[in-house]
């Protein structure tokens, strides 16, 4: 329980770290935060073209695009959070050696910035559902419990891999 108390006591540092991660991800980029929309959108377009047309396989039909978007956006959240979070302890080694704070803040901030990115990307799902006439159903309320479970799973994996990454270089 002391970990939760420490995180609560250092919540401002956590919030600042999340903001820094989000700004740093798009700093120097011409499109900035628009990449939160474009990255999953471009992935969807590639999968939409590659699988049914080039390979002649995959799920087809009128909801194929929605099918792709609802799978790629959560996967992108998971993949990005694990990739960034795994190397986060080693990347912030200098500050860890100089200042005391709960070390869990560093990987946690990576996952939280991934959640913010995910929620921004969810606007794409909403736009496509409304734009294609599929509409939104009552299943939308399941997004938040699923997001909590996926975030906790991602956080657990990130904690384990970031600890291993300090000692093993190739993770």
Predicted features along the sequence, with ranges:
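Hydrophobic transmembrane alpha-helices and immediately adjacent juxtamembrane helices
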Residues: 1-171
């Amino acid at each position: 329980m002391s970990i939760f108390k420490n995180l609560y006591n250092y919540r401002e540092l956590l919030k600042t770290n999340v903001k820094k991660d989000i700004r740093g991800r798009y700093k120097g980029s011409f499109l900035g935060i628009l990449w939160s929309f474009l990255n999953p959108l471009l992935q969807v377009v590639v999968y939409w073209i590659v699988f049914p047309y080039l390979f002649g396989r995959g799920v087809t039909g009128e909801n194929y695009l929605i099918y792709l978007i609802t799978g790629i956006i959560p996967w992108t959240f998971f993949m990005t959070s694990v990739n960034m979070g795994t190397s986060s302890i080693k990347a912030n080694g200098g500050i860890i050696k100089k200042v005391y704070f709960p070390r869990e803040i560093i990987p946690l901030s990576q996952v939280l910035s991934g959640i913010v990115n995910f929620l921004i990307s969810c606007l794409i799902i909403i736009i496509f559902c409304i734009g294609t006439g599929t509409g939104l159903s009552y299943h939308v309320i399941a997004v938040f419990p699923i997001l909590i479970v996926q975030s906790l799973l991602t956080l657990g994996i990130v904690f384990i891999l970031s600890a291993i990454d300090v000692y093993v270089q190739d993770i």
